[in-house]
Design a protein with these regions (language model features):
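Single-stranded nucleic acid-binding surfaces, predominantly the OB-fold ssDNA-binding core
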Residues: 1-85
Length: 85
């Protein structure tokens, strides 16, 4: 398990879906762009998916702690929104 910390800007719409089978009930998937212009796909499940869908939108800045999966995507374990001044 690889834990990572990322800070970036949301550059895509947040795609929210309900899941029929499996241990999770919902998923939110979106992309962020980090400081060096790398684009990373991130995803959150259940409560995190609800938070992402209801509280975040394109062009928001976020800080996340997550786990790198086998596809190179980040599964969010903690997320925080912030503003640049």
């Amino acid at each position: 398990m690889n834990i990572c910390f990322l800070m970036g800007k949301i550059i895509s719409e947040i795609n929210f879906k309900f899941m029929i089978q499996g241990k999770n009930k919902s998923i939110a998937i979106f992309q962020i762009e980090v400081e060096n212009k790398t684009i990373i796909t991130v995803k959150g499940y259940d409560e995190i998916a609800d938070y992402c869908y209801n509280q975040l939108q394109k062009d928001n800045y976020i800080i996340i702690m997550g786990i790198l999966d086998y596809k190179g995507e980040i599964e969010i374990t903690e997320i925080e929104q912030f503003t640049l001044k």
